[in-house]
């Protein structure tokens, strides 16, 4: 008996092979399997945002004007969150709230869930696109891993935080001034700037900006002169075989400046990846904590002493008073459905007043 060993070859391509060939074909803009998720979701998210900021009011959800049609500009227009009474409803157009009525769906805030969900899956599709392309050209997947950081922040802020609160109402609306209002809300109600996870996020973002500036300047400073051009761009040869800049010179320079310097390019670039990604992930974890109403640092001894001694005040106690002011003034206008009325005598006043 004869046994033949070898790979089983298919005589003809099946549907999957045909789709794979078409999706992963070499073209100007790569599509790929990830594109089946990315492109439709990005299209609907951006389309929903442009539609909402152009035409849709927030009168029925926030008591606000939020569209170009009502007189807003690019900084003040927004796609606003649904009303608090709708809690965590996904607000499908065909759901029990809108019942297929597109106008009513827009009035209830359906565009916000539409933009948020399609935006989230669009970002995930973009990360998968980086995985797919990296695998195709045999690269490591660190670009996709790095992009997980802004995705983590987006998911924590726009989904996990409002899921921990009473509804989508407390998520940020999609607009510039709307995001600023949300930041003030986070400070007043959660003392976010004194949260250690926020501190790590700030250190990550600002540290990454510093590293980026230092690295770019150092490379420009230590470029090899491989041409006779008047500037570094004309002198650059895209097919050069040697390295572009002198790591040895850069190392000697920073060793003299700081006393320490990176001596290994791999460690240097990993550090530039690690700092911002870790910072953003820590910030995302902090927002998850806020969803559960975990508190930031409380320096109670300073608050007690400030309450007892009119002459004692720290920057911390001043900030606590500012937070109380934000809560008292903001809650009434930010949550009109609660009909909150604060008498003048209960509004916070600092020691200086």
Curated annotation (Swiss-Prot):
Pfam families: Photo_RC. The modification Phosphothreonine is found at residue 2. Pheophytin a binds at residues 130, 143. Its main location: plastid. One of its GO terms (cellular component) is chloroplast thylakoid membrane. A plastoquinone binds at residues 215, 262. One of its GO terms (biological process) is photosynthetic electron transport in photosystem II. The D1/D2 heterodimer binds P680, chlorophylls that are the primary electron donor of PSII, and subsequent electron acceptors. It shares a non-heme iron and each subunit binds pheophytin, quinone, additional chlorophylls, carotenoids and lipids. There is also a Cl(-1) ion associated with D1 and D2, which is required for oxygen evolution. The PSII complex binds additional chlorophylls, carotenoids and specific lipids. It is found in: Plastid membrane. One of its GO terms (molecular function) is iron ion binding. It is a multi-pass membrane protein. The chain crosses the membrane at residues 41-61, 125-141, 153-166, 208-228, 279-295. It catalyses: 2 a plastoquinone + 4 hnu + 2 H2O = 2 a plastoquinol + O2. Chlorophyll a PD2 binds at residue 198. Photosystem II (PSII) is a light-driven water:plastoquinone oxidoreductase that uses light energy to abstract electrons from H(2)O, generating O(2) and a proton gradient subsequently used for ATP formation. It consists of a core antenna complex that captures photons, and an electron transfer chain that converts photonic excitation into a charge separation. The D1/D2 (PsbA/PsbD) reaction center heterodimer binds P680, the primary electron donor of PSII as well as several subsequent electron acceptors. D2 is needed for assembly of a stable PSII complex. Belongs to the reaction center PufL/M/PsbA/D family. HAMAP family: PSII_PsbD_D2. 2 of the reaction center chlorophylls (ChlD1 and ChlD2) are entirely coordinated by water. PSII is composed of 1 copy each of membrane proteins PsbA, PsbB, PsbC, PsbD, PsbE, PsbF, PsbH, PsbI, PsbJ, PsbK, PsbL, PsbM, PsbT, PsbX, PsbY, PsbZ, Psb30/Ycf12, at least 3 peripheral proteins of the oxygen-evolving complex and a large number of cofactors. It forms dimeric complexes. This is Photosystem II D2 protein.
């Amino acid at each position: 008996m004869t046994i033949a060993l070898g790979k089983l070859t298919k005589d003809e391509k099946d549907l999957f092979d045909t789709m794979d060939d078409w999706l992963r074909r070499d073209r100007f803009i790569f599509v790929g399997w990830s594109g089946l998720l990315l492109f439709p979701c990005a299209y609907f998210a951006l389309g929903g945002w442009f539609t909402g900021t152009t035409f849709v009011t927030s009168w029925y959800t926030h008591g606000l004007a939020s569209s170009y049609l009502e007189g807003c500009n690019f900084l003040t227009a927004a796609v606003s969150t649904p009303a608090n009474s709708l809690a965590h409803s996904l607000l499908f157009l065909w759901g029990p709230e809108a019942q297929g009525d597109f106008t009513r769906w827009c009035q209830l805030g359906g565009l916000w869930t539409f933009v948020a969900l399609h935006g989230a899956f669009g970002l995930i599709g973009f990360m998968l696109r980086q995985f797919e392309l990296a695998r195709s050209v045999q690269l490591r997947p660190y670009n996709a891993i790095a992009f997980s950081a802004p995705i983590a922040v987006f998911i924590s802020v726009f989904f996990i935080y409002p899921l921990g609160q009473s509804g989508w109402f407390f998520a940020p609306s999609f607009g510039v001034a709307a995001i600023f209002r949300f930041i003030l809300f986070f400070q007043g109600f959660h003392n976010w700037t004194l949260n250690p996870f926020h501190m790590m996020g700030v250190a990550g973002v600002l540290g990454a900006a510093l590293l980026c500036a230092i690295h770019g300047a150092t490379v420009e400073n230590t470029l090899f002169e491989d041409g006779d051009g008047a500037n570094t761009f004309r002198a650059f040869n895209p097919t050069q075989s040697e390295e572009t800049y002198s790591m040895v010179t850069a190392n000697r320079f920073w060793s003299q400046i700081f006393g320490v310097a990176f001596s290994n390019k791999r460690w240097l670039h990993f550090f530039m990846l690690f700092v911002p990604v870790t910072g953003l992930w820590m910030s995302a974890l902090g927002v998850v904590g806020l969803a559960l109403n975990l508190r930031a640092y409380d320096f109670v001894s300073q608050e007690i002493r400030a309450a007892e001694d009119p002459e004692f005040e720290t920057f911390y106690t001043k900030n606590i008073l500012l937070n109380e002011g934000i809560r008292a003034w903001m809650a009434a206008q930010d949550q009109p459905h609660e009909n909150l009325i604060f008498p003048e005598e209960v509004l916070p006043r600092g020691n200086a007043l």
